[in-house]
Design a protein with these regions (language model features):
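AMP-binding/adenylate-forming
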Residues: 63-70, 86-141
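Conserved ATP-dependent adenylate/AMP-binding module captured primarily in the ANL superfamily
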Residues: 1-29, 69-88, 118-130
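Gly/Ser/Thr-rich phosphate-binding loop
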Residues: 142-194
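Conserved pre-ATP/AMP-binding loop-to-beta segment of ANL
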Residues: 32-50, 83-84
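AMP-binding/adenylate-forming catalytic core of the ANL superfamily
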Residues: 226-274
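Conserved AMP-binding A3 loop
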Residues: 46-70, 80-82
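Conserved S/T- and glycine-rich ATP-binding loop of Class I adenylate-forming
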Residues: 51-54, 87, 102, 132, ...
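AMP-binding/adenylate-forming core of the ANL superfamily
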Residues: 205-233, 262
Length: 274
């Protein structure tokens, strides 16, 4: 079992637990959390993860718990998360995004509120959260409730241009994430509410390109670099602008047109879904 896997300041729904009592409570109230905690606290140094298919066909892979802890610490440092901060997990625990929200809370000593995923997770809450993770779909249906969040990360797909305009200069710090299961969740964040266009690497991460596609180097997490299908404009080894997927490029008379870039431009002129 990795050191740092459980912070004694961790709370679930505002209540402190010993590790043993946490397992008993999770078993009674949230089976998926219980199953994850059983695996997280066993003697194995790894945990089984299911990939979403970003870098190929969906598959299962064994991930080192120490690497998940390091990823949580790097996110905490980047976003200045503090012990006792209230965090909301409204993502499924089947995949890396939901699992890492739990890991961040366990490692950093956050007060975690865990609810069933829905399109508007904040609707039933009156209290304010310091840290929340959404999908773009959840974000689009929760705009009116963003005042309940201090820092929000959004992953699983790009935020559309219409929503970005709404978010610009919002009091909530909203970040779009870039990453995948193989990199233990995100390795770069884009500060959307400040109008930023580029993703900025977390500590220990750097980037290169090959044929305009992003290559990821991640100290202590990746044993070898990952070559992606993401077309980017590389600003530096720490920053890039995401353009789209190379497998979505349209070849029109030998002119390469990026599907996502075209969609972003059209969304500024077309107000109805297309």
């Amino acid at each position: 079992m990795s050191s740092g896997f459980y912070n004694n300041d961790f709370k679930l729904n505002g209540v402190s637990y010993s590790l043993e009592s946490l397992l008993l409570t999770a078993n009674a109230v949230h089976y998926n959390l219980f199953e994850f905690l059983k695996e997280w606290t066993d003697k194995s140094s790894t945990i089984m993860l299911q990939t979403s298919g970003t870098t190929g066909l969906p598959k299962k892979l064994q991930m080192s718990k120490s690497k998940m802890i390091l990823s949580a610490q790097r996110t905490g440092a980047f976003l200045n998360l503090q012990t006792g901060d209230k965090a909301l997990c409204c993502l499924p625990l089947d995949y890396i995004a939901g699992k890492m929200m739990v890991v961040r809370a366990l490692v950093l000593g956050l007060d975690l509120y865990l609810i069933k995923p829905s399109k508007n997770p904040l609707k039933t809450f009156s209290n304010r959260f310091d840290f929340v993770a959404f999908t773009p779909y959840q974000l689009e249906h929760s705009i009116q409730h963003l005042g309940k969040i201090k820092t929000l990360i959004v992953g699983g797909g790009p935020i559309n241009e219409k929503t970005k305009k709404i978010l610009y200069k919002n009091e909530t710090d909203v970040y779009e994430t870039y990453g995948m299961t193989e990199t233990v969740s995100h390795v770069a964040l884009k500060h959307v509410s400040q109008g930023k266009q580029e993703f900025k690497a977390l500590k220990g991460v750097r980037f290169e390109t090959k044929n305009n596609c992003l290559k990821i180097f991640c100290d202590s997490i990746l044993t070898s670099p990952i070559m992606t299908n993401d077309v980017v404009n590389l600003i530096s080894e720490k920053r890039f602008v995401w353009k789209g997927r190379v497998d979505f490029v349209i070849n029109s008379g030998a002119i390469k047109i990026n599907h996502e870039e075209l969609e972003n431009k059209l969304s500024k002129a077309i107000s109805v879904p297309y």
